[in-house]
């Protein structure tokens, strides 16, 4: 959607969801730095993000969702209900205590997702977002083609450059090639912590 720059306000989430479902790419504030995202089941939009950022396709991409319960049919382990409860509760407690978002690496039934989300890995990186507006946006993205409400979330920058921290910096990177959500982030100082769901190891 090159040449279709648009700035959405916080009260236009339905329009934002429609834009994303039509294949648009969006820069938006997250818990810390700005993110760059799209509907996680639109492979053309995902490839546009990878090309815009000059990102290694093997790295995979983080996705956001609004609640752990969305993942029930996706997670590829036994006792999934107790694990999902743990994910939700631990995420909430961790964010409250550390003022830092938490991204999980979880085993999945990979055949149901675009392979580019996983890259060269065997797990999906998923964050149960604590940003109120992004929670609402993920919910608005739920559809027959995206039953999990997944929103791609990669840092808003060119590969190896400093992530954007405000609208002006985001527009400086991508100009009229994408759209923007003009609202506030949560102001966390650090990027999300990354934790392996099964092994329990913190990787970042």
Swiss-Prot record:
Enzyme class, spelled out: transferase
Pfam families: Sua5_yciO_yrdC (PF01300)
EC number: 2.7.7.87
Recorded name of the encoding gene: tsaC
Molecular function terms, GO-annotated: ATP binding; double-stranded RNA binding; L-threonylcarbamoyladenylate synthase; tRNA binding
PROSITE patterns, alphabetized: YRDC (PS51163)
Organism: Moraxella catarrhalis (strain BBH18)
Keyword Cell inner membrane: no
Residues covered by the YrdC-like domain: 10-204
Gene Ontology CC terms, in alphabetical order: cytoplasm
Catalytic activity: L-threonine + hydrogencarbonate + ATP = L-threonylcarbamoyladenylate + diphosphate + H2O
Role of this protein: Required for the formation of a threonylcarbamoyl group on adenosine at position 37 (t(6)A37) in tRNAs that read codons beginning with adenine. Catalyzes the conversion of L-threonine, HCO(3)(-)/CO(2) and ATP to give threonylcarbamoyl-AMP (TC-AMP) as the acyladenylate intermediate, with the release of diphosphate.
The protein's name: Threonylcarbamoyl-AMP synthase
InterPro entries with a match to the protein in the record: DHBP_synth_RibB-like_a/b_dom (IPR017945), Sua5-like_dom (IPR006070), TC-AMP_synthase (IPR023535), TC-AMP_synthase_SUA5 (IPR050156)
């Amino acid at each position: 959607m090159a040449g279709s720059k648009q700035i959405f306000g916080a009260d236009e989430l339905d329009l934002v969801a429609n834009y994303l479902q039509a294949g648009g790419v969006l820069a938006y504030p997250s818990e810390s730095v700005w993110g760059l995202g799209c509907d996680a089941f639109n492979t053309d939009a995902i490839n546009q993000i990878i090309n815009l950022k000059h990102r290694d396709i093997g790295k995979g991409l983080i996705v956001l969702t609004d609640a752990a319960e969305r993942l029930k049919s996706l997670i590829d382990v036994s006792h999934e209900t107790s694990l999902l409860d743990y994910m939700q509760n631990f995420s909430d407690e961790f964010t409250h205590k550390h003022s830092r978002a938490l991204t999980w690496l979880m085993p999945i039934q990979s055949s149901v997702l675009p392979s580019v989300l996983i890259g060269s890995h065997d797990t999906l990186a998923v964050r149960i977002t604590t940003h109120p507006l992004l929670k609402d946006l993920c919910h608005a993205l739920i559809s027959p083609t995206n039953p999990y409400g997944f929103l791609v979330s990669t840092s808003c920058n060119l590969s190896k450059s400093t992530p954007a921290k405000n609208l002006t910096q985001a527009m400086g990177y991508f100009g009229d090639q994408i759209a923007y959500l003009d609202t506030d982030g949560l102001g966390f100082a650090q990027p999300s912590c990354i934790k392996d769901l099964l092994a329990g190891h913190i990787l970042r």
